[in-house]
């Protein structure tokens, strides 16, 4: 990472935004980087195959704020998506400049959020002003992330918060994050998302429900050689928040794909099991009718699939476009 940042500097790049992974933080790979601002978007179950407990997972994330970010640095916190016990540990006994964002009382407060077709309309309060903006994204979690990003760049004193928020109206969504791919002949929507944890899956299904008049279809699986405990939980989420479930392979890696699918199926009642991901997606698309939506989860932007240690080209986007067109 340090070598790549040095190359960027030599190329004339002055500012960089990076994701500080919990693995990287725990392994001290982010240390000695000149960081001006840090954002904490959410805290939910993930990477427990590595960290073992939520406490150790948080401890790794917290290093960014407690040990790496300078005392005069900017901290941006999404207060709706992080438990208070974690927020308190980040904000207590430090001298950081802090910007909070959320629906409850905060520095950047969401007063109103209206879900429109492929857009979200917002009324916000910031600096004792109320402003209205329309962001070309759906999904409240995506809106929170966009607002956090807009606040974080104000660490550059030449960028005002109102100006930064207004630029969100021209934002292009991230590939594979609640991304609309297209619709079939019945105008049923087909979406792709990277959700691969219980919380993320619940968030995205709850959001999709707002735009689904009839049945919400879900195609998903779980990664191999990762946290086994989340598979049962993801099955529960699928059962509670979708109408038609097809359990398929994600990236089994070196695990038995059938074993992974069975771990998920233990908490579902009427799920369909189709190991081949292409066949699973096709089965779902073929069943879609007017008023339905399909969400294909787990791989998002990825363009490969790993089965039995072999990596092959596979893109949910390409498969969907090939099938429905």
Language model features with spans:
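Conserved nucleotide-sensing/catalytic segment adjacent to the nucleotide-binding pocket
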Residues: 1-21
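Acidic, Mg2+-coordinating active-site environments of NTP-dependent enzymes
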Residues: 11, 35-190, 265-267
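Local beta-strand N-terminus motif with an aromatic residue
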Residues: 13, 35-36, 72, 216, ...
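Short beta-strand segments
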Residues: 19, 42, 78, 219-221, ...
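Conserved helix/coil segment N-terminal to the catalytic DExD/H
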Residues: 23-31
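Inter-motif core of Ras-like GTPase G domains
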Residues: 31-43, 213-218
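ATP-dependent carboxylate-amine ligase
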Residues: 92, 151-176, 180-325
